[in-house]
A protein has these predicted regions:
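Cofactor-binding loops of NAD(P)H-dependent oxidoreductases
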Residues: 54
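Short glycine/proline- and acidic residue-enriched helix-loop micro-motifs
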Residues: 75-78, 140, 261-264
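A hydrophobic C-terminal alpha-helical subdomain
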Residues: 232-283
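Electropositive phosphate-/nucleotide-binding environments in soluble metabolic enzymes
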Residues: 18, 86, 121, 180, ...
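N-terminal Rossmann-like NAD(P) cofactor-binding module of classical short-chain dehydrogenase/reductase
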Residues: 66, 70-73, 105
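Oxidoreductase cofactor-interface core, primarily capturing Rossmann-like NAD(P)-dependent enzymes
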Residues: 2-46, 57-60, 67, 78-84, ...
Length: 283
């Protein structure tokens, strides 16, 4: 078992938490997976996997399980409210510190520190700052857009019918990464805590505009996929004010924060390319 042997993981039924869980187990870590409903989570029985029933809204439901943990991987969602996300993050940091957790890895979002006015970016910056002030050894990850966002049923169904419909303009350049790579990077950090202590890392493995995304889909799927921009008023109506504000910002600003992507790929070899990812999930 690695030196930081026991890792507490949140969001294990989601993309990032699930990827962290899988990759940590592959490398011999003991994982404590926090879930609200183990029966619904349906996590396979695996050696070194301990499923913990608890709720991030109720620290008393999970704090005793942090006592023997060496590390925490934290990924939170804002979908139940920004204030709730911030409170969950602060409380998990506080309880981790009280239980002498040695290392805290937080998956935030790229651009969280830029005063964009995007609520679910700025909430994560508050959690980042609370982690820094906690005194715990830590690494903060700032992933770019996830490939997995393209698996949202409404998006995927349109792609399968020949249209990539997104709120971004056709020439808006974005950076992307897979959740699986975030899980691999998280595992590398826990294997090498001295190397990554105190670092804040922007993460991306691909950079494309809307038309390039559609062209890559066309190549990987062997059929024509056309890009189409979702009108702003529909974005706001369907996705809400927060995401509409985010896409408006992305459409009007430089959202490419990883300036040396090759250096990142050299640091973390084997990152998944977009075409490779499409072939796995759309064929």
């Amino acid at each position: 078992m690695p030196a930081l042997g026991k890792i507490f993981v949140t969001g294990t039924t989601g993309n990032q938490g699930g990827a962290a869980l899988r990759n940590l187990l592959k490398q011999g870590f003991h994982v404590k997976a926090l879930v609200r409903n183990p029966a619904v989570a349906r996590l396979d029985h695996q050696e070194n996997l301990e499923v913990i029933k608890g709720d991030l809204n109720e620290p008393a439901s999970y704090k005793q399980h942090l006592h023997e943990c060496d590390g925490v991987f934290c990924n939170l969602t804002y979908i139940h409210g920004i204030d709730k996300e911030i409170r969950q993050g602060f409380e998990l940091v506080n309880v981790s510190r009280e239980n002498n957790v040695k290392y805290f890895v937080y998956s935030s979002v790229i651009g969280s520190d830029l005063n964009t006015g995007i609520p679910h970016w700025e909430s994560k910056n508050k959690i980042e700052n609370h982690i820094r002030s906690s005194g715990m050894d830590h690494t903060i990850l700032r992933p770019s857009s996830l490939y997995e966002n393209l698996l949202i049923p409404q998006v995927k169904s349109r792609i399968l019918k020949g249209k990539l419909v997104l709120p971004t303009k056709k020439n808006t350049v974005q950076q992307f990464i897979s959740s699986e790579d975030i899980g691999k990077i998280t595992t590398t950090i826990f294997l090498n805590p001295e190397k990554y202590r105190g670092k804040t890392m922007n993460l991306a493995s691909e950079q494309m505009d809307g038309e390039q995304l559609a062209a890559t889909f066309s190549k990987a799927m062997g059929k024509k996929i056309k890009f189409q921009q979702l009108p702003t008023f529909i974005t706001r109506l369907v996705m809400g004010k927060d995401l509409a504000k985010m896409f408006r910002w992305v459409n009007n600003n430089d959202a490419c924060f990883v300036k040396d992507m090759q250096a990142l790929k050299n640091e973390f070899p084997g990152m998944i390319g977009f075409e490779e990812w499409i072939r796995v999930h759309f064929n």
